[in-house]
């Protein structure tokens, strides 16, 4: 009939019986317990569905000119060189350089060793003039040192995050979830093995507990999930390509707008 057949024993420990051992040796393994059998069937169906997916080709990412530079500026440049949507930043280390072509801007410390800039007063938002920028830079320099970054303010949106950790056995494992200052509190993330397509990234996003937040709440427009998934897929190809050179990457937040998304902060551990 072409239907698959499984040998299942309802009694625990049956796998040690002579008939079970001989059957297994002949290529017909006996599954020990109905629960184990059902889990196995579920896994087989999941694998069947996985093989049946036609997500299309992976994004093309050219890393021939990409370089892993120091600090946040270096991380953002690596992502920008790989085609990801990154906010432009200007590094400064003296007051005379603390100027911008357009306002409002954000000023962030670039002092080494500070992972959470907001916790130490290392981020000043909505700076509206050159005078305000100089005052903010003077204050930040006095507390945290002269290294800083200036970037244009980015439109509001839903704050998401992307990350990767390299497991010694499985290689890079990518994280997708809700980000921003509440990332560690929400802990709403899913994991995926790179590389993958935007369609797979969308399936990951749909598994998040707070997925509905991306659909717009109380009059706010829906977020551009497609743009975020495109960025996640491109990021997955990047980290898979550089798997032997990068141990960790944290991108938080990725601000997902009504149209498009923007990476505003990143850290690379090579």
Could you describe each region identified by the protein language model?
Residues 1-270:
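ATP-dependent carboxylate/acyl-activation modules
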């Amino acid at each position: 009939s072409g239907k698959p057949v499984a040998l299942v024993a309802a009694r625990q420990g049956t796998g040690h019986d002579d008939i079970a051992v001989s059957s297994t040796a002949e290529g017909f393994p006996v599954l020990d317990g109905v629960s184990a059998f059902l889990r196995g069937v579920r896994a087989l169906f999941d694998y069947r569905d996985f093989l049946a997916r036609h997500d299309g080709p992976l994004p093309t990412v050219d890393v021939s000119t990409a370089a892993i530079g120091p600090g946040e500026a270096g991380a953002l440049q690596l992502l920008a060189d790989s085609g990801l949507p990154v906010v432009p930043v200007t590094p400064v280390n003296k007051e005379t350089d603390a100027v911008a072509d357009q306002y409002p801007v954000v000023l962030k410390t670039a002092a080494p060793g500070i992972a959470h800039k907001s916790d130490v007063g290392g981020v000043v938002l909505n700076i509206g003039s050159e005078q305000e920028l100089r005052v903010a830079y003077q204050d930040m320099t006095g507390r945290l040192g002269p290294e800083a970054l200036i970037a244009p303010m980015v439109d509001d949106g839903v704050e998401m995050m992307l990350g990767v950790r390299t497991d010694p056995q499985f290689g890079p494992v990518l994280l997708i979830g809700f980000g921003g200052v509440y990332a560690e509190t929400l802990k709403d993330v899913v994991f995926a093995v790179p590389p993958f397509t935007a369609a797979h990234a969308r399936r990951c996003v749909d598994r998040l507990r707070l997925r509905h937040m991306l659909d717009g709440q109380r009059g706010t427009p829906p977020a551009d999930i497609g743009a975020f998934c495109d960025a996640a897929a491109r990021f997955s190809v990047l980290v898979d390509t550089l798997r032997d050179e990068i141990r960790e990457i944290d991108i938080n937040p990725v601000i997902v707008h009504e149209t498009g998304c923007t990476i505003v902060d990143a850290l690379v551990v090579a």
